[in-house]
């Protein structure tokens, strides 16, 4: 095996081992030594690829991202109306959560860790940021589609909470309880009603 391919395989093995342990034990419950042991490499080799455990955590989260699902978030900021923006964002977030239970689990761990440095991913520039979504909400406020008295940050937070809630409750236990089109329509209608009144 040539050196570049071996290096790539080692990196993949480290990320795969870290993912398994982070999903099982969270950030604080997993040490670099644990990851090295599972990956069958020296701890120092992990530090060759990653400057610290936080960088490895963010890389693991990035490895869980399905670019196709996340690109639909980018489509949200292209919408001309607040109604279509909310509908696209609800649908995009539904698809992301429904197709990625491992990401939900790692985000649950992240919330429990109470460590703000764990937020985001290593290559954040590839995805639409919360700042961009908030900027789009402010555009809708400036164009009269949404009351200016509402905080753009809290609007995005409210949409995020509404779209993740079913997945943090019982969705994983009974996937038949949530019908995609009904969820998108009902959630969109309720959010629009809440923001317009």
Task: For the regions a language model picked out, list residue spans one by one.
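Amphipathic alpha-helical packing segments from all-alpha helical-bundle domains
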Residues: 68-76, 95, 99, 116-143, ...
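Helix-turn-helix
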Residues: 13, 17, 21-55, 59-60
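Short helix-capping/turn signature of helix-turn-helix
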Residues: 50, 109-114
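Helical hydrophobic small-molecule/effector-binding pocket
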Residues: 86-109, 160-164
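Short coil/turn segments at alpha/beta junctions that flank glycine-rich nucleotide-binding fingerprints
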Residues: 24-28, 100, 143
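N-terminal intrinsically disordered/low-complexity leader segments
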Residues: 1-9
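Amphipathic alpha-helical linker/stalk segments
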Residues: 58-88
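Hydrophobic/aromatic-rich alpha-helical bundle segments in the mid-to-C-terminal region
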Residues: 104, 119-120, 127, 138-189
